[in-house]
Amino acid sequence: MPTSVKCPTCQKDVIWNNESKFKPFCCERCKLIDLGDWASEKHAIPVKPEFDADDLDNLGYDEADFFKEN
């Protein structure tokens, strides 16, 4: 029995096999809608910021000093 998944955009059933041209999407339209959502930042992968602005302030980093010449 072939594996079936839901299209992430329209929730239509999609057969998952080598002939599925747009998998996991059902069609090119749904694929492009999803791409547009990523491009407009409706979708995002959550990440923890490498540096917290408050931590940098506590360490003594000041934006005003950044552009001063020595």
UniProtKB/Swiss-Prot annotation:
Keyword Metal-binding: yes
Binding-site residues, Zn(2+): C7, C10, C26, C30
Organism superkingdom: Bacteria
Gene Ontology annotations of biological process type: regulation of DNA-templated transcription
Organism: Shewanella woodyi (strain ATCC 51908 / MS32)
Identification of the protein by name: DNA gyrase inhibitor YacG
Gene of this entry: yacG
Assigned protein family: Belongs to the DNA gyrase inhibitor YacG family.
Cofactor binding mode and count: Binds 1 zinc ion.
Assigned keywords, A-Z: Metal-binding, Zinc
Taxonomic lineage of the native organism: Bacteria, Pseudomonadati, Pseudomonadota, Gammaproteobacteria, Alteromonadales
Subunit details: Interacts with GyrB.
HAMAP family linked: DNA_gyrase_inhibitor_YacG (MF_00649)
Gene3D superfamilies: Erythroid Transcription Factor GATA-1, subunit A (3.30.50.10)
GO molecular function (one): zinc ion binding
